[in-house]
Amino acid sequence: GLLRRTHGGAVANDRLLVETPYRAKRHEHVRQKQAIAGAAVDLIKPGESVILDAGSTTYFIATLLKSRPPDGLTVVTSDICILYELADCPSITLIGTGGTVQQGVYAMIGSHVESFLRTIRADRAFIGAHAIDMETGLMSPNPEKASIKALLCAAASNTHLVVDSSKFGIGSL
């Protein structure tokens, strides 16, 4: 088959699902990602703790949060670019998950991230996906990232999937 089920989603058995480098993803579907970011930021209330998954859509959420941060906001992320974007924003308490940096993708992965995520609770998590299949669910080309996404969801009281239209139908070839 094209996919192999894992805890929290599915991963590709072959090369159909290949992770696009972060720098390229940030320039794809920009208008959709900006609209998604606006809707996401509107959900965040002052004093909340928010988890931002690693990815280009969540990066757009971070850039918008930087320009209009709610009072008392705490952001947790495994994304190096989001950490850098929010690092000089004094009104946001910023927490990085630690872990091993995935080259070209700038996501922190590994057992350090998983251990950390098991110890926290947040009001909201904004989760991206490489692909979505209506039967299988969220898909990732990387089993470690699939596991981390499941832990991100478990750590939050409210989970919001933030994906643009390009994520649908990738695994159906």
Report the location of each language-model feature.
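Short, well-ordered alpha-helical scaffold segments within catalytic/effector domains
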Residues: 33-41, 58-59, 114, 146
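HTH-adjacent hinge/linker in prokaryotic transcriptional regulators
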Residues: 1-51, 63-70, 87-91
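Conserved phosphate- and dinucleotide-binding cores of soluble alpha/beta proteins
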Residues: 5, 80-173
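Short, well-ordered coil/turn residues at beta-beta hairpins
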Residues: 53-54, 128
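Gly/Ser/Thr-rich loops at beta-strand to alpha-helix junctions
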Residues: 50, 56-59
